[in-house]
Amino acid sequence: MTARRVANASGPWLAAYQKARERTETLVKPLSEADQTAQSMPDASPVKWHLAHTSWFFETFVLKPNLPGYSAFDPAFEYLFNSYYNSIGEQFPRAQRGAITRPGASEVLAYRHHVDKHMTQLLSQLSPELLNSLDTLLPLGLAHEEQHQELLITDLQHLFSINPLYPAVTLPVQAFAPVAALGWWPFPGGLVEIGAPAPGDASDVHVDDSPSFRFDDSPSFRFDDSPSFRFDNESPRHQVRLYPFALADRLVTNGEYAAFIDAGGYNEPLHWLSEGWAWRCREQISQPLYWLRRAEQWWQYSLAGLHALDPHAPVRHISLFEAMAYAQWCGCRLATEFEWEHAAARVEPSDSVYDPTILAPQPQSQSADQLYNCLWQWTQSQYQPYPGYRPEAGAVGEYNGKFMSNQFVLRGGSCITPPNHIRASYRNFFPAATRWQFSGIRMAKDD
């Protein structure tokens, strides 16, 4: 994780903090107390827990060590809302977070406001020395808040999908136009540079006197094309040898994936990894998550409610196992994360608008290639450290590195990913069976 020094930082950092926190609360305004408390599965967390945990992060890593006289809102929250930081202390079991009926939503909101009040106090009196000590923690805390905005949405959608009323809490989804036949971008291979540049590199120059988290006053905000923050797992920058390959020029659509289903793709073990086939059989998987078959027609649930499946929209909520099976059926494969980054680094992320009132892929908000801002794209690469990787010192070193086992990398960001996280070097990661994230398929092949 790196951050460039900023001048006169108190005002911009305070504004960035307030905007990030306000945006989280904007997402939950339509929700009831029950909506915020329930938990649909062990991998998901209640909305209320996300609201509290992000406050716990600022309280634990920023306020307690740096604001003299700070008093915790409730000492018991250190146990309730610690996620996985073993060096901080024990945690309440993740799979039982839905049992935390108290504190209620109003008390969690009071906790957030308590933390906000004291963060405002701290950020209003930043000295050069304090800024120097917080130049990693402040951007990390904001990035962490934004990551939980996306997780909050995916967890809420999974919860609502179980409800037979299929609640709608956002504007209707818009139909995609028919797509052209799949095309391919060829790449010759060779030695390529992968990873985020180190601070001070020519590609890392930044002269703005404000933080990299850029906000405006509207419900939507636009991507800042020069973010200064990088997670530690995006570094060090290093060379990788690529062999000639081609990358598909768009994502796989619902209609194309439905053809895989109609062809018996879920029943043909030759398409599947051994572990994927065992998962498919054990869980009785026969279509993507949130697809329903009614009256000989496919339907899909989203936070806009239940609607007829759009055959031209990109297929989403797909596991790595399903993505690999589909690619095998097509005679293709998934890209490695290095192939994806090499291709995507040549494309500027679109000046996309993130809108919390529309939480599904939208045809007008993406470039035709759908590299960024549409769906997270599975790669065949296992999540591993780059050569020379070193986690951050102290408890925040548990943020990324300790999860580099039994997970696969996704790239590109989704329609619900905050724009500060949209960049070629960003590495998301999940276990291969994960489906409740906004994940899709981009194929590759040897050239």
Language-model features and meaning:
Residues 120-127, 348:
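Helix-capping and short linker residues that terminate individual alpha-solenoid repeat units
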Residues 1-45, 49-57, 61-122, 131, ...:
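Disulfide-stabilized, aromatic/cysteine-rich ligand-recognition loop
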Residues 202-216:
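Long, compositionally biased low-complexity repeat segments characteristic
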Residues 35-36, 127, 334, 351:
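Secondary-structure boundary/capping signal
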Residues 185-187, 213, 240:
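Generic detection of short hydrophobic beta-strand segments and adjacent strand-loop junctions
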Residues 42, 179-180:
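Short acidic, Pro/Gly- and aromatic-enriched capping/linker segments at domain boundaries
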Residues 141, 151, 155, 159-174, ...:
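Functional-site microenvironments in short loops/helix caps that host divalent-cation chemistry
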